[in-house]
């Protein structure tokens, strides 16, 4: 939850489905699908929406290429300067000071992202200016809610530190289920699921409240008002 993807990944998902079917799913329909907890991968989500709409299903690689064309607008492995796609429409939700604050509060940090590595590295390293940030991106581990990536990252960050608490912040049911599954696989650690509603809902009080309730129902331990609010939560935990 460090960038607003309503105009990029969500838009590419809509455009991909429309490309194959002529039907453009509404944001609320995508939210409902994501709320099921198993469609964190936007390629899979695109295929599932096509299936439910009764549209012929394309070959997976063909769909990935179409999606990538909308999202990157160029070769994902090429220089970001050559990209002309929706990735250029991603307002940042945080700045680099957040991670310095987290470090100052005594916590290590890293990222488990469902984004392709070029996209994740671009936002973390070039836009936020983070140097070699700990990152598990698409392809480095199975898609969430499989906890492998979170378990791997937490092991790397906590190894030798003596710390036993892991807090993971996400904005989907799949993120919460990832924490729950990690807890089942590694019960010796304290796992905390932090959740936040995606920014496209922040100006829709009723929809946001309903979305946050779904996150709570899925097992979120704490609902935050924004990603930047994580430092307030960390300070509050230090006082208890």
Residue ranges and their predicted role:
Residues 1-32, 44:
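Active-site neighborhood of HAD-like aspartate-dependent phosphohydrolases
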Residues 168-222:
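Acidic, Mg2+-coordinating phosphoryl-transfer loop and its flanking beta/alpha structural elements
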Residues 14-20, 43-58, 153:
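Helix-loop "lid/cap" segments that line or gate small-molecule binding pockets
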Residues 21-34, 54-69, 74-76, 130-133, ...:
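Short, surface-exposed acidic
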Residues 221-230:
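Short acidic-hydrophobic, aromatic-tinged amphipathic segments that line or gate anion-handling sites
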Residues 110, 115-167, 173-191:
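Substrate-recognition "cap/lid" segment bordering the active-site pocket of phosphatases
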């Amino acid at each position: 939850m460090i960038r607003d993807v309503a105009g990029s990944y969500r838009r590419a998902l809509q455009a991909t489905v429309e490309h194959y079917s002529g039907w453009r799913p509404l944001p609320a329909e995508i939210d409902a699908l994501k709320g099921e907890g198993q469609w964190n991968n936007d390629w899979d989500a695109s295929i599932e929406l096509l299936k439910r709409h009764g549209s012929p299903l394309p070959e997976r690689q063909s769909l990935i290429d179409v999606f990538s064309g909308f999202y990157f607008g160029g070769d994902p492995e090429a220089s970001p300067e050559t990209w002309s796609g929706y990735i250029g429409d991603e307002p940042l939700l945080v700045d680099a000071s957040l991670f310095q604050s987290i470090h100052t509060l005594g916590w290590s940090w890293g990222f488990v992202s469902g984004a392709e590595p070029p996209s994740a590295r671009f936002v973390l390293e070039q836009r936020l200016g983070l140097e070699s940030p700990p990152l598990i991106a698409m392809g480095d581990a199975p898609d969430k809610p499989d906890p492998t990536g979170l378990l791997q990252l937490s092991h790397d960050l906590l190894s030798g530190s003596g710390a036993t608490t892991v807090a993971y912040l996400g904005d989907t049911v799949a993120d919460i289920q990832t924490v729950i599954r990690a807890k089942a696989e590694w019960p010796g650690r304290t796992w905390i699921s932090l959740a936040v509603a995606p920014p496209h809902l922040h100006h829709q009080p009723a929809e946001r409240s309903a979305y946050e309730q779904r996150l709570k129902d899925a097992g979120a331990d704490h609902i935050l008002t924004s990603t930047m609010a994580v430092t307030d939560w960390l300070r509050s935990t230090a006082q208890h």
